[in-house]
Structure formats: C-alpha cells, structure tokens
Amino acid sequence: MSFTPFSSFLEASFFQTLAAKKLNEYKLDDSPKRVSAEYTWQQGRLVFDSDSFSDRDSHCKGVVECPGTLLNYNTIEEFKGADKKALLAEWGDKMLSGAIMNGSIFRNPEILNSFLLITFCDLKKYIFVYWMGVPCLNTKWDLQEVADEGNYTNLSTRIPALGESFVVIDPDDNVTPFSELEYVERSEDPTIAFLSPTSPENTPWTVRNICLMLHILGFKSATMILVGREKNRFLEWKRGDGELGAWTGWEKNSAGKLLPKQTNLGPLLNPLQLASQAVDLNLKLMKWRIAPELDLDTIKHTRCLLLGAGTLGSYVSRSLLAWGVEQVTFVDNGTVSFSNPVRQPLYKYVDCLDGGKPKAETAAEALKEIYPAVKTSGITLEVPMIGHSTTSSSEKRVHQQYDELVSLIKSHDAVFLLMDSRESRWLPTVICAALKKKCITAAIGFDSFVVMRHGVEGVNDLGCYFCNDVVAPTDSMNDRTLDQQCTVTRPGIAPIVSGYGVEILQAMCQDEPSAPHQLRGFLHNFSTVKITGQRFKCCSACSPVIVQEWKDKTWGFVKKALNERGFVEELCGLAELQRGVDELDFGEGEGSEEEWEM
C-alpha cells in the first residue's frame, strides 16, 4: 500500500511574520521554536500563515491544526550543512515516539501529523529557503482494506461537530474522545476514526504514524476509519514482527526531487514597504550583538526641526534618515546657488537654474526622493536676528516670522541650529531654553568646528552656544568681504560635525550619561576635545532672567532685543559685568621698571 505525503503551502504572511520575528525577537537565537500549520479536510496540504506563530483562537469545522517545530538557521551554509536525515530522525523520536511513550499522544492526537520546518531568511533580499518534513517510519505495515461493517455514515458530521479530528469508536458505535484509547485493553481491537487529509482513493501519511502508535502501545490489531466528506475508507491493521525501518518524510520540491524550496517575496512587496523594512533592518541588526539595549523607537519618533538647509542641514538630515527618524522639517530663507550642489548633497545642478529653487522646499523634496516614507516639509522663513532692527514697514512681517518660528519649535522635539551667523542662532536658543527643547548647535570654521547640546534642564544645567560670550551677538553680516560672506571651510569638516550632532542627539534619546556636552575639533592637527561647561548666569540667551523675560513678554521682548542695541546686555547683567571690569584699578607694580629689563 502506498501513502500520500503532505505537501506544504507557505503564505506570504508566514514569511513576513517570520522575517519580523527573526529581526526583532529571534535575532541570533537558532533554538527550536513551536509553530503550527493547518490542513483542510481531504486537501492534504499543510498551510502556514501568520497565525502559525501563535495559539489559534478558532477551530473551523473540517480544519485540522498540526503542531510542529521550526528551526531557523542563521546562515545558508548552516542550512545546507545540516544532516537532514539525522535531523528528521531526531525530531521523529522527540515529537512522535516520545509523545506516544509518555502518553501525551492521548490528549494531543494531532501530534500524529507533527512536522519539522527548517528555514533560512535572507532579510536583505527577502528570499526564504525552507524544507518541510513530516517524520514517519519507513515500515511495511500489515494493512488491508476492508468493507464497511458498521453504521458510520454520519461520522463526517459528528466528528467536526465535536471539534475533534481523531476519535475512538467504542463497541456500541459511539464516538468518544481519543483519550479513551489509553484505557482500551491492549488485547482488544480498537477502532480509530480521523478526518482524512487526502481524498478517499489515497492513503494519507497519517496512517503510518497511527500504525507506529498502535505498535508502540502494544495492540495486536486495530481498525482505522478514514473519514471523508462523502465516503469513508476502512483499513485493518495487524501487528507484525518486521523491522520498523528508518525515519523518512522530507517533502519533494516541484521537480519531484528531495530538495528544499525557495520563495522570493521581493517582487511581491510594495517598493515603499521594502525601503522601510530595509531601513529598519540596518538599525535593528545593531541590537543583535553590539547594542542589545538600544532604544530605536525614541529617536525614530523624535520630530526634528533643522534651522538651516545648507551644508550642515544636508548632512544632518541624511544622518537622521539613517537613524530611522520619521519627521524632518527644514527652515531656510535662501535659494540654491551654483556653488551649493558640490558641497550640499541634497541639491543638484538643475536646482540652481532660473535664479535657484528655494532651499528648504528643495531639500524636503530631495529627502523624499531618497526615502519616500519620511514625513518632511520645507518652510521658507527668515529667523529674526538680534541686532537686525525692524522698521515700521517690516515689523509686521518680522512679527509673523517670529510667531511661525515659535510654533515650529513647539511642534518639534529636537531643534538643530545650523545657520551661518551667530545672531541667527540667538532667538532659537532663547526659545529652546524656555520651552526645554533638545537643541543641538553646530558651527564650522575653516578647519575647526564646535557641536554642542543645550536647551534641556538637568541636574547640572549645561551652557549654550552663547555662555562663553561677554557681549551679546550683534549684526555681523554687514561690511563683509566676499571670503567673509561665504562659508569657507575644508570640505570634509561638515560631514564630521553633522555626524557628531546627530550622534549626540541619539545619545540624549538613550539617556546615555556619556553623551558629551560639546565637542570641539581641529583639522589642522586632527584632534577632537570633549568639553563640559555650565550655564553662565549672565548668558545673553539662556540665563534665567532672559528666559523669564521671553516667557513674560514674548514678542515685546524680542522686538526690543532686535531694535535696541545694548538692551539684552543690560538685562542679563553682561553690561554690569563689563562696567565692573572697567572700574578695576590694577595700579602700578611694586617693582621698578629696571627690574623688568632683560
């Protein structure tokens, strides 16, 4: 008698769930995992889907759940090198023979259809290699087909109605739970009925394992009823004395060969979905070995505002994308010039034509082209600058710009100050200090740079960009030569400082105590210095009196700071400090002039 093996059908949802579990849960863990599959009555096909990894809540009539084991290998070499014959024998002994001998088969007869599924996932290309085996012994059992000797025509409705797939028929033709088999005398001839996985003319793989069970339990003979939807088959089993044989059961591929199968989901997935998953892949791989405690969600959901869409803004935005940041907003009031594309990677030559496109909007469009799933926008806005006075005709416009800037900072979690001038950084620094927003300032010179964090209050309040100044910033943009108007720097310095800025933000999101306050770098000798500085009580931007004045008077304070030279210095105490220094009388030295002669 020949037997029809199970075939496998793995739905796309199974592979997607497996990929997610491999990336987020299993990682490098290749230990056996419990999974399940289902077969529909008389179809003979084990179906795997996303529910294969969890307990199935419902049990449809005519659908049988089969328990199994998943072995997911970390490399294709491990998959290929596994001893498939020994593997099937090992799991046949564990899953089937073990369950029969320890008695768990009586409570879980579905183990008779248990399977082993070995897989390898190429998460970069979304290619999955797999091989399913339903272990059974290659034994020549004494099986004979016999005629229907009882009134079993209603089994096709009675068994599914009980929510069972295997039952025992007692001598009075009553359908009883399979667990009753445990109490049947071994000298008796039990009758076992089950929902056949195959059509009536075929003998399912399950019969082999029922024969093994009867043999191990010590029965002399038994009757099996293969229950079909319209017709039943009856088989009579008798115990033999022959060898049990070796384990078999690996599924053949579509070419009829004993080889694994392969599925490529790449062409079936939405390209945007593939891009999103690829971004997550590179980040989540960090958690496999190097940084298992890394919190990726915090920075991912950090809404970032970039004030400045030039060289620094371009590089910062790319690094934020690489960290998986979902929302990036650009603010700039310039247009793309012909000198920009070679230094600012978000722009192209065509962006410079016809007077140049607006930088902020163009940067957002370029970022969207790189990663379409990012939420990004560009806003053309001039940041009000201390020392740049307003006129009666410009006051309304500047006031609107101020209101929009405040609204933007309030609606974001982290602010990057990436502008060209010191005075343009002053107002955002004040607002971030007042609103306690994470703020990263980056500035570059010809061969030097500084990048620092501030804005968020802590146990030890850190200084801001202006805490080392003894004067408030003023208009530094007038009366400047060409080399002073342009940012003249070594080309490699912008990517360095931008990378540092984003990494400092990431460290802040992780609450890492090692996150530096500021880094100062010098390319003339290729050195970087880590510095910590406390907040200056007379700082023109983050001192308590300045912050409180902004909270109390908002635009009134800002308007005065823009128009009245010396107002901020008087308010924060810098002017008083300067007067105190001027009044110091250093006097004459006690030694005579001759004593200092060499």
Curated annotation (Swiss-Prot):
One Pfam family per UniProt: ATG7_N
Protein name per the record: Ubiquitin-like modifier-activating enzyme ATG7
Cellular localization per UniProt: Cytoplasm; Preautophagosomal structure
Molecular function terms from GO: Atg12 activating enzyme activity; Atg8 activating enzyme activity
Family stated for the protein in its record: Belongs to the ATG7 family.
GO cellular component, one term: cytoplasm
BP-aspect Gene Ontology terms: autophagosome assembly; cellular response to nitrogen starvation; mitophagy; piecemeal microautophagy of the nucleus; protein modification by small protein conjugation; protein transport
Reported function: E1-like activating enzyme involved in the 2 ubiquitin-like systems required for cytoplasm to vacuole transport (Cvt) and autophagy. Activates ATG12 for its conjugation with ATG5 and ATG8 for its conjugation with phosphatidylethanolamine. Both systems are needed for the ATG8 association to Cvt vesicles and autophagosomes membranes. Autophagy is essential for maintenance of amino acid levels and protein synthesis under nitrogen starvation.
The protein's assembly and partners: Homodimer.
Active site, UniProt feature: 486 (glycyl thioester intermediate)
The organism of origin for this protein: Yarrowia lipolytica (strain CLIB 122 / E 150)
Main location: cytoplasm
Motif GXGXXG motif: where in chain: 308-313
Lineage summary: Eukaryota, Fungi, Dikarya, Ascomycota, Saccharomycotina
Entry's free-text remark on domains: The GxGxxG motif is important for the function, possibly through binding with ATP.
Record's keyword terms, sorted: Autophagy, Cytoplasm, Protein transport, Transport, Ubl conjugation pathway
This protein's encoding gene: ATG7
